[in-house]
Regions:
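ATP/NTP phosphate-donor binding region
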Residues: 1-10, 20, 24, 28, ...
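ATP/nucleoside-binding phosphotransfer catalytic cores, i.e., glycine-rich phosphate-binding loops
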Residues: 131, 137, 162, 172-200
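Conserved Motif II region of HX4D acyltransferases
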Residues: 17-18, 143
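N-terminal glycine-rich "phosphate-gripper" loop used for MgATP/nucleotide binding
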Residues: 12-16
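Short glycine-/acidic-enriched loop or helix-start segments at secondary-structure transitions
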Residues: 21-24, 44-46, 154-155, 182
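Short acidic/glycine-rich loop or secondary-structure boundary segments that cap or lie
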Residues: 93-96, 137-139, 151-154, 178-182
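Catalytic core of DAGKc-family lipid kinases
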Residues: 27-145
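Gly/Ser/Thr-rich active-site loops/lids in small-molecule metabolic enzymes
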Residues: 104-111, 145, 151-180
Length: 200
């Protein structure tokens, strides 16, 4: 991407990880990014309603049908930095992503469900969050920083989600095991209006 400024736009063909990496490198350059869904989940392309056909993608660019969205940055303890555009997770979510990696090519999106069922008793941890200068102490099996919230089957992790407001939605999986997540998952599936008491 060193010569990206010489082009009118950049097409990132791949899954969410590939697209997020390219988006992070192009952040604040003003160069349009066109995500072409060629990975396992392609959730960012789905949230953006990005077409899966090259001609249609080129048509979007010609018409300048573009939008800005937020990019998150993660810095590891060793100083390494990388970005995310959809969701960043620690704990159970990260374990699912890692567990799904070997079987994604064979199983596709089902690899994530298989990895989740294989780790039905994730580690329960104390969680310390610093949000806008305020420290929050909580506990659970994981925490998510959400930019775009829509997953497969038109399920949204949070009800009111604005990926262009300069903020992330933070969700703590406040349970001792995966079974405790079932009510929240069902409410996300059944209650699209956000009226269910357990709805994030």
């Amino acid at each position: 991407l060193r010569d990206a400024e010489n082009f009118d736009a950049v097409v990132a063909a791949g899954g969410d990880g590939t697209v997020a990496s390219v988006a992070y490198l192009l952040a604040e350059t003003g160069i349009p990014l066109l995500p072409f869904p060629a990975g396992t989940a392609n959730l960012l392309a789905m949230n953006l309603a990005s077409p899966a056909e090259p001609h249609a993608l080129a048509h979007l660019m010609r018409e300048q049908r573009l939008m800005d969205f937020d990019i998150g940055e993660i810095e590891l303890s060793n100083g390494e930095r990388f970005g995310f555009s959809m969701i960043a997770g620690a704990g159970y979510d990260a374990a699912i992503m890692e567990g799904a990696e070997p079987s994604k090519r064979l199983l596709g999106p089902m690899a994530y469900f298989t990895a989740a069922f294989a780790n039905f008793a994730p580690q329960f941890s104390r969680i310390t969050l610093t949000i806008d200068g305020k420290t929050v102490e909580t506990q659970g099996v994981g925490v998510l920083a959400i930019n775009f919230s829509k997953l497969q089957f038109d399920i949204s992790l949070v009800h009111e989600n604005l990926p262009r407001d300069g903020m992330f939605d933070i969700v703590v999986m406040n349970t001792h095991d995966a079974v405790g997540l079932i009510p929240a998952i069902l409410s996300c599936m059944l209650d699209r209006a956000g009226e269910f008491p357990s709805r994030p």
